[in-house]
Amino acid sequence: KSISIEIFGLGYVGFPLTVRLASAGFQVTGIDVNQERIQRLENNKLMDSEIHLEKEYIDCRQKNNIKLESKPSNSTIPKVGIICVPTPIPTKNISSDIFVKSAVESFLNCSKPGDVIILESSIEVGTTEIISNIIKNRGFEVGKNFGVCFCPERIDPSNKEWGIENIPRVIYCSDNSSFDIAKGIYLHVNGGNLLKVNSPKIAEIVKSFENAFR
């Protein structure tokens, strides 16, 4: 699999995704700014809610399919950054997309033409466009030499019937090439069960509606 994947945020969304993609044979770097979390994972210490992934995780580590870092690195092969960081409730001093923007900026520090960002974090309507503008300000042409996708996570921790491996996903991509890359990744997540939409706001509204429904 001739791409490198960096997953930002190793919480209840990013960690299972890291393990699933590494098990499929991808080279995955799990990135988290929480040094304690990185250290615990280096020592194979998982949270109680992750124990069911322990054997699979350790197998992936032994095969060197998972690296753990606090920041991204340069790569000579095409790179995909999947953003799974938390989105806090906004306050007067903190916007809900502060961690998303920080992760994107971090990824862009080591990016090159041909790379792709996939947003999975819960974001407000209009955020994908904001992220696209951040990328453009770095000199990239979104949809031409740099891809942006929004494929909102749909994990419901209490739901035993529907999980990361079988729940359908909605996805927006800036261009067909990025969609092909994303589909190749999610083929190993949920069998590629993706509903493609032609506007980021549609995907954002779908996610907002689901959050409100829950």
Question: Model-derived features: where do they sit?
Answer:
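Structural/interface elements that position substrates and couple domains in central-metabolism enzymes
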Residues: 1-214
